[in-house]
Amino acid sequence: MGEPIYRRVVVKLSGEYFAGPQHYGIDQPTIDRVAGDLIAARGLGVEIAVVVGGGNIFRGVEVSARGVSRPTGDTMGMLATVMNCLALGEALRRHGQPARTFSALLMPEVCDLYTRAAAQQTLAEGGIALLAGGTGNPFFTTDTTAVLRAAEIDAGAVLKATNVDGVYTADPKRDPNAKRFERLTHSEALAGGYKVMDATAFALARETSLPIIVFSIAEPGSIGAVLGGAGRATVVAG
């Protein structure tokens, strides 16, 4: 594994992954393993911020189809991301890694309000910044949040952790002929309609010239491997 390609990154983690084999809620062994991977990556000298989804607990889009208004459903989903970040922060600190949870929603008894300056200070001091609450607004995904926060805090890239090792022409779990891309431009990712991230996230990444690295979180040590240029992944840039 070589020297890290980037010195500051935002890691986007799926809430569904936090559920582990139970497919709902928070699976502690899974959280601990993710925490270990983040700590190992931090040990490479990389400053790390993390955005976590909330789909293991609540999905606003799904309940909006059953009568709950989309703004209310999305706000409930934002609260789920806070729960995930609190769980991950606890695991990180238990393993000796300083971590601080920030939320785009004001909840001072629970965690700090997100500001660019406070998040950057945490990173500069060696802590991992956990960025919860989405953008604080409905209709924006946590993928878009990850790109937005990365642009705000001057990160070099977004590391998008998924259950497959990159962007494919089709779902590789359903189509054995699906081909993996080594590289895509932001425009190609948008034109292809690949579901690994939403169009708003890709468009914002293109506007801010921010690389997105799509990789599988399934293998232990995958975050550090990608940072060192050794892991299988698709780079979306240019």
Swiss-Prot record:
Molecular-function GO term, any one: UMP kinase activity
Superkingdom field: Bacteria
One term under GO cellular component: cytosol
Reaction equations catalysed: UMP + ATP = UDP + ADP
Keywords: ATP-binding, Cytoplasm, Kinase, Nucleotide-binding, Pyrimidine biosynthesis, Transferase
EC assignment: 2.7.4.22
Annotated residues for binding of ATP: 12-15, 55, 59, 162-163, 168, 171
Pathway: Pyrimidine metabolism; CTP biosynthesis via de novo pathway; UDP from UMP (UMPK route): step 1/1
Keyword flag Transport: no
Regulation of catalytic or functional activity: Inhibited by UTP.
Record carries keyword DNA-binding: no
One GO process term, biological-process aspect: 'de novo' CTP biosynthetic process
Binding positions for UMP per the UniProt entry: 54, 74, 135-142
Cell compartment(s), UniProt: Cytoplasm
Oligomeric and partner information: Homohexamer.
Function: Catalyzes the reversible phosphorylation of UMP to UDP.
Family membership noted in the UniProt record: Belongs to the UMP kinase family.
Stated name of the protein: Uridylate kinase
Native organism: Rhodopseudomonas palustris (strain HaA2)
Lineage per the UniProt record: Bacteria, Pseudomonadati, Pseudomonadota, Alphaproteobacteria, Hyphomicrobiales
The gene coding this protein: pyrH
